[in-house]
């Protein structure tokens, strides 16, 4: 029995070495990015609760944009990984073109929305339960931050188009290096511009936004310039700019398979943002506590998020090469490994997570809320790891309609109503509400297990 389990779910060293060589650069890249976000969050937090809350709300809105970009590039990446696995560089080039067009279109829409409805969107998260005018200040700081952050959306879109194509070829080092340089720049400029160190003026939340925008341009330039210099390693760039068309067959295939994925990312992100809005009716303290907790949680969930993302690349390449049994075998082992690593990280977060809120310059009530939110997130995290791995398994085989139902439809049918009803119509404390809403992940785990086990995702599409 044990031998059978080991054969099915435990790989040998060569297997894990291949997996980790792909995953570790991505984990390190995101670890550095989230660490700098954490430091940025602390520095903004030193300015006051209103500044921290205003910035947090805008970042929540930008999160929806980021996921829309992720959805746009992921739609083409379904085919990109399989095109590369098959050696079809022209097909890979068409998927790259699609990414550029889609991300720039999404960016244009986001900028227009922020320009016309920015104030109204931020105000949705501001409920004045105390009557001290703190919400008006949070709105003011949020608008200042948002105005500058919009300038950084275009380089982010271009960078994602290039970086995802580079990763599909198995080259994860350069995107990681670019990210390291960018986040290092961001961290230094944050400190200088937020607090007015040396010749720099004290810009507060505007300084935080400027630092982020400058870093995004640097990251995009590094990735784009490297890709064009090393054409031999990035053959999808051959002819990428000599024309602008995408053959109807390829475009239709990407849209049919990818549109549900794009919509899924947008609707899921919008759903999570709506859940946060539901929590926010309990007051500005809750917004601040959630901001601190999510920043800490993001430091610990990097491992399972990136291990899950690698599943779609590895399994996608096996499927593209027609190695269907190898794809199933690798998927089983990667899911188990991802969950195992997450259990370790969750235990660590549960033990040490409560120390982090004390770093922030805020009230004791907000620190206590943040500590409770962190503990709840640690308990639920291993279940999130399994559902996340299941999602990328289904996506690797092009089952985007299934992933749409699994992810965003689940969020809007189960999670959002639960958060809304509990926050608006019960007398439960916010921590109890948060625990119950997070606990809906258990339902998703069961659904994910059944769908992965059915092998509906074992499909060669190219």
Regions found by a protein language model. Give the residues of each.
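Helix-terminus/linker motif at the lipid-water interface of multi-pass membrane proteins
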Residues: 31, 35-53, 122-136, 192-203, ...
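Transmembrane alpha-helix boundary and packing residues in multipass membrane permease domains
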Residues: 26, 30, 42, 59, ...
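Short runs within selected transmembrane alpha-helices of multi-pass transporters and secretion channels
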Residues: 73, 77, 148-168, 175-186, ...
């Amino acid at each position: 029995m044990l031998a059978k389990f080991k054969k099915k779910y435990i790989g040998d060293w060569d297997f894990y070495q291949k997996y980790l060589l792909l995953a570790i650069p991505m984990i390190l890249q995101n670890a550095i990015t989230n660490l700098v976000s954490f430091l940025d969050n602390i520095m903004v937090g030193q300015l006051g609760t209103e500044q921290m809350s205003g910035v947090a709300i805008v970042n929540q809105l930008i999160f929806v944009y980021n996921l829309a970009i992720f959805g746009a590039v992921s739609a083409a990446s379904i085919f990109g990984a399989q095109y590369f696995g098959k050696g079809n560089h022209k097909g890979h080039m068409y998927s790259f073109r699609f990414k550029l067009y889609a991300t720039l279109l999404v960016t244009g829409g986001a900028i227009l929305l922020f320009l016309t409805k920015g104030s109204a969107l931020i105000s949705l998260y501001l409920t004045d339960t105390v009557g001290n005018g703190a919400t008006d200040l949070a709105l003011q700081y949020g608008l200042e931050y948002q105005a500058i952050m919009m300038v950084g959306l275009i380089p982010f879109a271009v960078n994602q188009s290039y970086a995802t194509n580079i990763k599909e070829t198995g080259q994860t080092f350069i995107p990681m290096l670019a990210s390291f340089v960018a986040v290092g720049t961001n961290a230094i400029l944050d400190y200088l511009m937020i607090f007015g160190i040396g010749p720099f003026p004290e810009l507060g939340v505007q300084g935080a936004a400027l630092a982020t925008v400058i870093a995004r341009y640097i990251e995009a330039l590094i990735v784009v310039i490297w890709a064009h210099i090393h054409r031999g390693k990035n053959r999808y760039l051959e002819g990428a700019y000599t024309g602008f068309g995408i053959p109807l067959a390829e475009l239709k295939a990407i849209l049919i398979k990818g549109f549900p994925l794009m919509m899924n990312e947008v609707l899921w992100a919008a759903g999570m943002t709506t859940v946060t809005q539901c929590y926010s009716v309990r007051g500005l303290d809750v917004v601040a506590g959630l901001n601190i907790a999510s920043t800490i949680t993001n430091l610990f969930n990097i491992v399972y998020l990136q291990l899950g993302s690698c599943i779609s690349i590895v399994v996608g390449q096996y499927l593209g090469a027609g190695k269907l049994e190898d794809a199933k075998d690798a998927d089983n082992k990667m899911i188990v490994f991802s969950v195992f690593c997450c259990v370790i990280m969750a235990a660590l977060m549960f033990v040490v997570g409560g120390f982090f809120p004390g770093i922030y310059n805020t009230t004791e009530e907000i620190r206590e809320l943040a500590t409770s939110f962190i503990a709840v997130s640690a308990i639920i995290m291993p279940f999130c790891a399994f559902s996340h791995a299941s999602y990328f398994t289904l996506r690797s085989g092009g089952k985007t309609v299934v992933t749409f139902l699994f992810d965003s439809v689940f969020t809007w049918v189960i999670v959002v109503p639960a958060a809304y009803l509990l926050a608006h119509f019960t007398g439960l404390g916010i921590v109890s509400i948060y625990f119950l809403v997070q606990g809906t992940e258990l339902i998703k785990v069961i659904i994910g297990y059944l769908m992965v086990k059915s092998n509906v995702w074992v499909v060669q599409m190219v």
